[in-house]
């Protein structure tokens, strides 16, 4: 575990170092400046002087072990080596925010994965929202500034909401969050990439797609009556109870855009029917404590055959992860 922690911490620091020395091809200096500013907002919102090394976002969470089992008849159509065989998977379930005492009655559910193949790995960071609140750095910074101003008492919740309603990305995200159920378990939420990745097909062409991990048991929400009967900490116990009976399973599913879908727009829900391709099953079979809470799940760590999104926010988010990771070492 200590060696794994060192490896993934070092990955984050290498990304940060590469930025500082300008060796990442095509990276603009303003992208790094934006990432630094956003990281600063996260620390203003969530820092704890008594625990300066804590994870600054998605602080409340726990770890699990599992495996990816490929759908052989499907993955043979892709030139992505890591998908061709079973892989061990490290899993982290969490809530957004920086407070370990946060109530499980919030709507957010998050899933981070480290899939380890024979010669390479794949890391993912997802939430149960299908979209992000921003499509570019300016929107990201504006959203975070409103959060900070609200915390500092400079604006009210109502004022912040009115300002957010004026920006399409913020309004879309608020609508998406409003539509989410409060699930009784992490096992009852679907988790989404938000970004559109490129997946190399056996033909050599790349298929553009978002991806989701969809629970085989279905997405389920709590009724008002059920919610009233629960305390603020029920997700971990619900997970332990469920996984003790049988593995928790998710379909690893590609969602292929239609002809007119805007693949670079991370704040736009793809409504209606889409081609869906189930690559295989994520089978989560064991609770594994809290050791992974200190690790970094870096979505820019991609395997052979998977191309990074070509949008205006993926690189920025990865840099924010790297910067906040380096700050808490």
Indicate residue ranges for each PLM-predicted region.
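Active-site-adjacent core segments of small-molecule enzymes
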Residues: 30-329
């Amino acid at each position: 575990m200590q060696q794994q922690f060192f490896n993934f911490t070092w990955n984050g620091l290498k990304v940060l170092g590469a930025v500082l020395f300008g060796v990442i091809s095509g990276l603009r200096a303003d992208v790094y400046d934006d990432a630094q500013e956003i990281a600063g907002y996260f620390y203003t919102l969530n820092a704890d002087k008594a625990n300066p090394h804590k994870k600054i976002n998605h602080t409340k969470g726990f770890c699990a072990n599992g495996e990816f089992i490929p759908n052989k008849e499907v993955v043979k159509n892709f030139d992505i080596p890591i998908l061709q065989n079973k892989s061990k998977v490290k899993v982290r379930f969490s809530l957004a925010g920086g407070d370990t005492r946060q109530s499980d009655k919030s709507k957010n559910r998050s899933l981070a994965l480290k899939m380890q193949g024979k010669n390479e790995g794949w890391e993912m960071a997802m939430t149960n929202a299908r979209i992000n609140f921003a499509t570019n750095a300016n929107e990201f910074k504006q959203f975070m500034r409103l959060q900070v101003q609200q915390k500092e008492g400079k604006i009210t919740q109502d004022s912040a909401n009115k300002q957010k309603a004026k920006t399409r990305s913020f309004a879309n995200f608020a609508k998406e969050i409003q539509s989410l159920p409060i699930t009784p378990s992490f096992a009852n939420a679907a988790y989404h990439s938000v970004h559109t990745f490129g997946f190399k097909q056996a033909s050599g062409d790349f298929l553009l797609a978002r991806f989701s991990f969809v629970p085989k048991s279905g997405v389920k929400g709590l009724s008002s009556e059920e919610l009233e009967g629960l305390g603020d900490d029920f997700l971990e116990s619900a997970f332990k109870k469920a996984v003790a009976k049988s593995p928790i399973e998710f379909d690893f599913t590609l969602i292929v855009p239609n002809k007119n879908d805007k693949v670079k727009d991370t704040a736009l829900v793809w409504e209606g029917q889409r081609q869906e391709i189930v690559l295989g099953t994520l089978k989560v079979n064991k609770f594994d404590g809290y050791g992974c809470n200190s690790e970094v799940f870096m979505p820019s760590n991609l395997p052979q055959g998977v191309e990074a999104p070509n949008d205006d926010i993926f690189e920025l988010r990865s840099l924010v992860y790297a910067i906040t990771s380096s700050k808490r070492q």
